[in-house]
Design a protein with these regions (language model features):
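Accessible peptide chain termini
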Residues: 1-2, 27
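A cross-taxon signal for low-complexity, glycine/charged-rich
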Residues: 2-5, 17
Length: 311
């Protein structure tokens, strides 16, 4: 349930294989598009499940439609060759297409597809608009003052994904708190995985600035071969914050009405817990800390069982 996900079993379903093939084909077509700047990434490149086989088959196309727009707009924000002004202008066009202010532009079809999906399902467009606002923030904001500042970013970049899925499956708003907590954890964990890359390629640091100052961590630490003592302290503080959020997130799968969504959520919770352990032990500056095939298999099987046999 966050901006960034991969299938738990390590295998793609036929639906996912078809979608990924179509998406990679679309990359070539979009390359000539003056608005999009595709990287070629798709749902198979993410850390956590994106519309996996666990979700109801009838709803997976709506998840794919939402993801495709998120991917396209995220790629714009992450394009180092574009100026901040250019990024904002492109993202603004996608947002205006979502809200109906730009009614007929073939280059904005991904926004129109989300509008059609929203009309068909009743899911609020705000969940897509919030993501675009997060990417606009990425275009102009490269540092975060404190944990609350970082959580404010996650409220736009991560929480809307979980809320979209809850609304799509007919869950009530009372589940938002647990979903927000889980999605925000996934976002922070992804930031910790990509600390060096985000700084070196985009000059972004998704760490609380006050924690860095207190620990004696400096920007240059992100260009070293391994994690410094000060930076390790900040990483561990972020993991402590994630652990607190997971206390809210872990009960979520047992609270959901839709059993298939509960299974997917239970899998994601276990993947998040596993990545928390790996990031405690590993050095994300020396090498990217990532989940392995056995992690996906183990978390997938345990999560599915937990979702099936809920109390």
């Amino acid at each position: 349930m966050a901006r960034h996900d991969r299938q738990c079993s390590g295998h793609k379903s036929p639906d996912d294989l078809t979608y990924n093939f179509r998406h990679r084909t679309d990359v070539k077509q979009a390359a000539a598009n003056s608005i999009e700047t595709p990287t070629g990434k798709d749902s198979g490149d993410e850390n956590f499940p994106v519309g996996s086989f666990l979700l109801p088959k009838a709803l997976r196309p709506h998840v794919a439609t939402y993801y495709v727009l998120a991917r396209a707009t995220d790629d714009i924000a992450d394009n180092g060759a574009l100026s901040s002004e250019d990024k904002l202008a492109r993202l603004d066009r996608f947002e205006k297409a979502l809200t109906g202010e730009i009614p007929d532009d073939p280059a904005l079809e991904k926004s129109y597809a989300v509008r059609r999906s929203a009309q068909a399902t009743g899911v609020p467009l705000q969940h897509a608009i919030d993501l675009i606002h997060a990417f606009k923030q990425d275009a102009v904001k490269q540092r975060y003052d404190n944990w609350d500042d970082l959580m404010g970013y996650c409220a736009l970049s991560a929480s809307p994904v979980g809320r979209f899925l809850l609304d799509l499956h007919g869950e009530d708003n009372a589940k938002f708190a647990g979903s927000d907590a889980l999605c925000n954890v996934l976002q922070v964990l992804n930031h910790l995985q990509d600390l060096a890359e985000d700084y070196q390629t985009l000059n972004r640091i998704y760490l609380p600035g006050d924690w860095m100052a207190a620990a004696g961590a400096v920007v240059d630490d992100l260009e070293r071969d391994s994690t410094t003592t000060g930076l390790r302290r900040v990483i561990d503080q972020c993991l402590d914050g994630c652990e607190e959020l997971m206390k809210q997130a872990r009960p979520l799968s047992r609270q959901l009405t839709n059993r298939r969504l509960a299974m997917e959520t239970a899998v994601i919770v276990r993947l998040a817990d596993r990545l928390l352990v790996l990031l405690r032990k590993g050095d994300p500056i020396a090498a990217r800390v990532a989940l392995g095939k056995l992690d996906f298999l183990s978390c997938g099987l345990r999560g599915i069982a937990a979702g099936l046999f809920r109390k």
